[in-house]
């Protein structure tokens, strides 16, 4: 398990505006707990993104490099 920005397809983060959205998303993907599985966290000049706590290794995370949307 690891703490990380959860990623969509093509190495893209889930942008957010509130902790509740991220906590639900992270928890549904197996993060630490229903009460605090994740939160909306600063992601640099690109805005805020969902940060997950103790996310399982089989769930994609943001890695170095650009988001490559099709």
From Swiss-Prot:
Q: Which UniProt keywords apply?
A: Disulfide bond, Ion channel impairing toxin, Neurotoxin, Secreted, Toxin, Voltage-gated sodium channel impairing toxin
Coiled coil ranges (UniProt) are: none
From the Swiss-Prot or TrEMBL record, state where the protein is found: Secreted
What Gene3D superfamilies does this protein map onto? Knottin, scorpion toxin-like
Concerning InterPro entries, the annotation shows: LCN-type_CS_alpha_beta_dom (IPR044062), Scorpion_toxin-like (IPR003614), Scorpion_toxin-like_sf (IPR036574), Scorpion_toxinL (IPR018218), Scorpion_toxinL/defensin (IPR002061)
Query: Can the keyword Disulfide bond be found in this entry's annotation?
Result: yes
In Gene Ontology terms, what is one molecular function of this protein? Answer: toxin activity
Checking Pfam families in the record gives: Toxin_3
User: Record's SMART domains?
Assistant: Knot1
Q: Which GO terms describe its biological process?
A: defense response
Which CDD domains does this entry report, sorted A to Z?
neurotoxins_LC_scorpion
Taken from the UniProt record, the cysteine pairs bridged by disulfide bonds within this chain are: 12-67, 16-40, 22-50, 26-52
Domain called LCN-type CS-alpha/beta: residue spans: 2-68
UniProt keyword Lipid biosynthesis, yes or no: no
Q: Which GO terms describe its cellular component?
A: extracellular region
The free-text tissue note of the record is:
Expressed by the venom gland.
Name the family the entry cites: Belongs to the long (4 C-C) scorpion toxin superfamily. Sodium channel inhibitor family. Alpha subfamily.
Free-text note on domains in this protein's UniProt record? Has the structural arrangement of an alpha-helix connected to antiparallel beta-sheets by disulfide bonds (CS-alpha/beta).
Q: What does this protein do?
A: Alpha toxins bind voltage-independently at site-3 of sodium channels (Nav) and inhibit the inactivation of the activated channels, thereby blocking neuronal transmission.
For this entry, the protein name equals Toxin Boma6d
Starting at the broadest rank, the lineage of the source organism is: Eukaryota, Metazoa, Ecdysozoa, Arthropoda, Chelicerata
């Amino acid at each position: 398990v690891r703490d990380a920005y959860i990623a969509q397809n093509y190495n893209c983060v889930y942008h957010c505006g509130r902790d509740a959205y991220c906590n639900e998303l992270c928890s549904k993907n197996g993060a630490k707990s229903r009460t605090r599985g994740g939160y909306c966290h600063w992601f640099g000049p690109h805005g805020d993104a969902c940060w997950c706590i103790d996310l399982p290794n089989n769930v994609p995370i943001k890695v170095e490099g650009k988001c490559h949307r099709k």
